[in-house]
Curated annotation (Swiss-Prot):
PROSITE patterns the UniProt entry points to: NDPK_LIKE
Classification lineage: Bacteria, Pseudomonadati, Chlorobiota, Chlorobiia, Chlorobiales
Family annotation (Pfam families): NDK (PF00334)
Biological role stated in the UniProt entry: Major role in the synthesis of nucleoside triphosphates other than ATP. The ATP gamma phosphate is transferred to the NDP beta phosphate via a ping-pong mechanism, using a phosphorylated active-site intermediate.
Assembly notes: Homotetramer.
Enzyme class: transferase
Protein's UniProt name: Nucleoside diphosphate kinase
Enzyme Commission number: 2.7.4.6
Name of encoding gene: ndk
Key words, A-Z: ATP-binding, Cytoplasm, Kinase, Magnesium, Metal-binding, Nucleotide metabolism, Nucleotide-binding, Phosphoprotein, Transferase
Subcellular location: Cytoplasm
Length: 140
């Protein structure tokens, strides 16, 4: 089983779409093995997205991710990373495929409802940022 990390971003929480997006995730065959509602500070958002520090959108991303609560989750499924990225769609909702999370719910490239890890290696690192081993509940 492969794992991936997702974050339901502040726009998702503000729009009261946690249930709708979580339902779509579960219907796609993912198991949620860790989940919590939290709020990132500018510092923690900056740490999480440090890989983008030199990119022009970094400041806006940190501001947005610290603007309200978010819901990180660890998901488990065969081929989890690729399947989840297909489920959520392109970063820009205008380019996302019909029926994807971002096409359905996102307003813009900057406020695009959800984060999804881009590799199994990054998923493990990102999961460790939000969850301790004790918080991960394996479902049989």
């Amino acid at each position: 089983m492969e794992r991936t990390l997702t974050i339901l971003k502040p726009d998702c929480v503000k729009k009261q779409l946690i249930g709708a997006v979580t339902d779509k995730i579960e219907r796609a065959g993912f198991r949620i093995i860790a989940m919590k509602k939290t709020r990132l500070t500018k510092e923690t958002a900056g740490e999480f997205y440090a890989v983008h520090r030199e990119r022009p959108f970094y400041g806006e991303l940190v501001e947005f991710m610290s603007s309200g609560p978010c819901v990180p989750m660890i998901l488990e499924k065969e081929n989890a990373v690729a399947d989840f990225r297909t489920l959520i769609g392109a970063t820009d909702p205008a380019e996302a495929a019909e029926g994807t999370v971002r096409k359905l719910y996102a307003d813009s490239k900057g406020e695009n409802i959800v984060h999804g890890s881009d590799s199994a290696e990054n998923a493990a690192i990102e999961a460790g940022f939000f969850f301790s081993a004790e918080e991960v509940v394996r479902v049989n």
